């Protein structure tokens, strides 16, 4: 599983200044000239805008498949090779209308471009017969080209969401998340090169699935499409749904370097994650099945689907120390374990 969000780099960056202290100074004097920590914070200026482009890529390969009946694994299963790939691209432009402490008070987000593509390649051999199948699908979102305003409600401790101009499509707003700035990866206090801090694992949902549920739907209904990646963003829930708030494990960040590049001051943050999640996806699948067109004479009775996965990854966040926003981010992950059980 690979996820590589790539926000646009900002060329308007601050020149760096470094302070050097002689090691020969006596202790009391040295204490007065300790190098200050870096303020790696999210604080864009009010009225400014930022364009961000994310690209998430995922590849799954089948390791083992079994069918059980009355608790017993059925013999004579065919040999099967299967690979599923999924690519999602998200482009937005955020206008920071009003800023609060560490987050916007009011944010206007325009969805510039939303696209999703999936493909599946399967080869099955049984009783000397070979059957090869290749499928591909695309998904789109009604949010594409629209503008959503996020307004912080201090009493409710949440963002209120509304279309601009107003539209009666509340279902599209329900799963949207305001944070597409990767704020979960930033330190709470000043840090020096080499300092580490712990990342709230549950907050990684906004990093792995930026923007929340973007309401992708298949462009065309495909008969028998149940197997197309188990609906990863193609009509059976988004990656945000699969992760939700059930993430467990650990995640750490480290200030690896503060450097100058083309006259810019950049903070380089190294990120490592080891996470796991268990999710009952039954309700999402049942809702998706209502819209599935089955071949004539075919009926499917669905009981449940559970997803269990473990993931490890490393990444690098480069932070613009002048505009106090993302310069770039790349995260590579791999599934140590992914099990899907359904009946």
Predicted segments, located by residue:
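Signature of exported/secreted
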Residues: 33-343
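Bacterial N-terminal signal peptides that target proteins for export
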Residues: 12-23
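Short, Lys/Arg-enriched N-terminal segments with co-localized hydrophobic residues
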Residues: 1-13
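Serine/proline-rich low-complexity intrinsically disordered segments, especially terminal tails, linkers
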Residues: 4, 24, 118-120
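Bacterial N-terminal signal peptides
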Residues: 22-32
């Amino acid at each position: 599983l690979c996820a590589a969000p790539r926000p646009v780099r900002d060329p308007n960056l601050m020149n760096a200044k470094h302070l050097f202290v002689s090691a020969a100074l006596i202790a009391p004097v040295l204490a007065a000239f300790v190098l200050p920590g870096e303020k790696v914070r999210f604080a864009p200026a009010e009225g400014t805008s930022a364009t961000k482009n994310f690209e998430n890529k995922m590849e799954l390969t089948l390791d083992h498949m079994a069918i059980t009946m009355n608790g017993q694994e059925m013999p004579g299963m065919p040999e099967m090779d299967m690979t599923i790939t999924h690519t999602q691209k998200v482009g937005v432009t955020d206008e920071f209308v009003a800023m609060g402490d560490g987050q916007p008070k009011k944010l206007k987000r325009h969805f510039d471009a939303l696209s999703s593509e999936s493909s599946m390649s399967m080869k099955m051999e049984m009783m000397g017969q070979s059957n090869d199948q290749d499928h591909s699908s695309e998904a789109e979102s009604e949010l594409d080209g629209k503008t959503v305003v996020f307004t912080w409600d201090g009493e409710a401790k949440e963002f209120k969401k509304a279309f601009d101009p107003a539209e009666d499509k509340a279902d599209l707003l329900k799963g949207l998340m305001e944070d597409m700035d990767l704020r979960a990866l930033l330190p709470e206090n000043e840090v020096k090169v080499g300092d580490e801090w712990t990342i709230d694992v549950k907050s990684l949902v906004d990093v792995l699935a930026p923007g929340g549920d973007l309401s992708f739907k298949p462009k065309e209904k495909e008969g028998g499409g149940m197997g197309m990646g188990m609906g990863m963003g193609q009509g059976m829930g988004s990656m945000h749904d699969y992760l939700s708030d059930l993430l467990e494990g650990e995640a750490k960040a480290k200030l690896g370097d503060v450097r100058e590049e083309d006259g810019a001051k950049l903070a380089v943050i190294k990120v490592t994650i080891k996470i796991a999640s268990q999710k009952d996806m039954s309700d999402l699948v049942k809702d998706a099945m209502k819209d599935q067109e089955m071949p004539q004479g075919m009926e499917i009775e669905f009981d449940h689907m559970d997803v269990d996965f473990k993931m490890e990854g490393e990444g690098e966040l480069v932070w613009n120390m002048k505009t106090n926003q993302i310069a770039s981010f790349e995260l590579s992950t791999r599934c140590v374990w992914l099990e899907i059980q359904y009946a």
